[in-house]
Amino acid sequence: QQRVAREHAIVEHIFSHAIVNEDEILTYFDHHLAPAETFNGDVFICKPSPSGGLYFLVGDFTGHGLASAIGALPVTRAFQEMTAKGLAVSELALELNNVLLRFLPADMFMAAVIGEIGADGKRLTLWQGGMPEMLLVSENGDVRRLNAKHMALGILESQEFNSDSDTLTMRHGDQLVCYTDGLMEVTNDKKEMLG
């Protein structure tokens, strides 16, 4: 019992130091991670781009618990290295797919949204694979639904993988809403799913 608790504490320490978002960058995002267990497969990473914009990744690994969370370590490291180089979103998607193919067992993958907001705050470049639809909500409440067009990361080999990204124009006051399937699986007091 004590050994398991100690091992969990060690792993939690490693995760808390490996997946760190800069406070200055986090001010541009409202985010909430509420794992059902101590460890889970949901990940949110945001980094500045060399051109003055912002990169972000919202990911959801298959499974639950520590086994699903472990994939976040190579993804975080690769994301940090590639965003520091200013790679395009499509290149990020391709490289993260390759990282996951190398590191994960064949039955694991990561649904993900990878995005870059341009320095002007207007250009939004997105790659979506295996995630629930995103919502682009205008200042006056109009909602544009953005559906994933690709398979999740870590499934297809490079020659089959589609890294095409979409570029959208955002207006002042627009909000981008992204969530994992965990939100749709939340239940009310009657055990009815809300999603």
Model-derived regions: residue spans:
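Short, intrinsically disordered, charge-balanced linker/junction segments flanking boundaries
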Residues: 190-195
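Short acidic/polar inter-strand loop motif in beta-rich domains
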Residues: 185-186
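… and, occasionally, acidic/histidine-rich disordered N-termini of signaling adaptors
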Residues: 2-177
